[in-house]
């Protein structure tokens, strides 16, 4: 496994600003939508409301309802729609409001989204991001507060990313959108920088203005050690 120090690079970038994780995610999606007309966003309350955790804020005003689709409350339907769009060459970002709800759409996720590429012998790509919120911290009960990234990590065919800071949140979203096969993108509500949740110093940090990728599958140096080799 190779190593990168993305947080240090973000802090030293000449055009960085301090953003919340929510704003960093939305900016990453917007930059990819500007770059690639095949990138679309769909899910419950992701348009007019901007996502209940702010991850799609401003996208409807910027790109319109043809590319930012508020869907009915049917996880099976809109995840299936996203999978079909990906197979046909688009790059959908689908928001599942809470990770806890994945069970009602398990067939679409596990038997279709994750497997189509392999069932086709590698001939069909599924460039799709399934984005979802995890964690608690604001009395929303056990059906809305679980951290289920480990469950997705055990599904063959899935890449799973869980950003812990705004710089990685933007870079990982861009990497996920550009990936040619499914990426499950899980954000913890506690690092989104939402005004109605407890303050978290990790929820706001320098984020470069330009589009950039945080590589998936590379470790980050969180803190350099001082031990010298024997």
Predicted regions and their residues:
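Thiamine diphosphate
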Residues: 1-198, 203
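A general structural motif
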Residues: 22, 203-221, 230
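Short boundary motifs at domain starts and secondary-structure transition points
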Residues: 30-32, 219-223
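A short, charged/proline- and glycine-enriched loop
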Residues: 37, 223-228
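Short cationic amphipathic helices and targeting signals
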Residues: 160, 228-229
């Amino acid at each position: 496994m190779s190593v990168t120090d993305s947080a240090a690079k973000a802090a030293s970038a000449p055009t960085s600003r301090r953003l919340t994780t929510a704003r960093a995610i939305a900016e990453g999606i917007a930059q990819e939508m500007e770059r690639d007309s095949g990138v679309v966003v769909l899910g419950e309350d992701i348009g007019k409301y901007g996502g209940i955790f702010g991850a799609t804020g401003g996208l409807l005003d910027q790109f319109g309802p043809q590319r930012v689709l508020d869907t009915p409350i049917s996880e099976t339907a809109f995840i299936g729609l996203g999978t079909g769009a990906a197979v046909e060459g688009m790059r959908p970002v689908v928001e599942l409001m809470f990770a806890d709800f994945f069970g009602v759409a398990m067939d679409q996720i596990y038997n279709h989204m994750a497997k189509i590429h392999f069932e086709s012998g590698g001939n069909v790509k599924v460039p799709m991001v399934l984005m979802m919120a995890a964690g608690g911290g604001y009395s929303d009960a056990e059906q809305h507060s679980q951290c289920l990234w480990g469950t997705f990590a055990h599904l063959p065919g899935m890449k799973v990313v869980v950003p812990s800071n705004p710089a990685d949140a933007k870079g990982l979203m861009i990497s996920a959108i550009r990936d040619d096969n499914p990426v499950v993108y899980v954000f913890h509500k506690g690092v989104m920088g939402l005004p109605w949740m407890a303050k978290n110093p990790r929820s706001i940090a320098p984020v470069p203005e330009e589009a950039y990728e945080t590589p998936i599958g590379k470790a980050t140096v969180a803190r350099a050690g001082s031990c010298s080799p024997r």
